[in-house]
Amino acid sequence: MARVKRGVVARARHKKILKQAKGYYGARSRVYRVAFQAVIKAGQYAYRDRRQRKRQFRQLWIARINAAARTNGISYSRFINGLKKASIEIDRKILADIAVFDKAVFAALVEKAKTALA
């Protein structure tokens, strides 16, 4: 039985990892052993941060809605409660967009929320 030489497979595997590590600083983009660890860690960060991105955007939307609501004389929590009581179903992403780009519409929503709370 012929001897199997694995140089071709190893070379391909190394090339694949080094290609993924392209653009990394120093040895992380040149040395296979270091690059492999860097690529694994990058994958872990990417996996974690895909989940964190959703939380961070929601936090950003809430901060923007709160700021706009307070300029109209109501807190965020009372504003959201008022919208629920007025049976206005707009998600936070759209509310934040309205708060930033269409202040008149946002002010009208605040008034509806205030009347629903009263």
Swiss-Prot record:
GO molecular function: rRNA binding; structural constituent of ribosome
One term under GO cellular component: ribonucleoprotein complex
GO biological process, any: translation
Cross-referenced Pfam families: Ribosomal_L20
Keyword rRNA-binding recorded: yes
Keywords from the named record: Ribonucleoprotein, Ribosomal protein, RNA-binding, rRNA-binding
Its biological purpose: Binds directly to 23S ribosomal RNA and is necessary for the in vitro assembly process of the 50S ribosomal subunit. It is not involved in the protein synthesizing functions of that subunit.
PANTHER family: 39S RIBOSOMAL PROTEIN L20
HAMAP family, alphabetized: Ribosomal_bL20
Protein family according to the UniProt entry: Belongs to the bacterial ribosomal protein bL20 family.
Name of the protein described by the UniProt record: Large ribosomal subunit protein bL20
Organism of derivation: Erwinia tasmaniensis (strain DSM 17950 / CFBP 7177 / CIP 109463 / NCPPB 4357 / Et1/99)
Gene designation: rplT
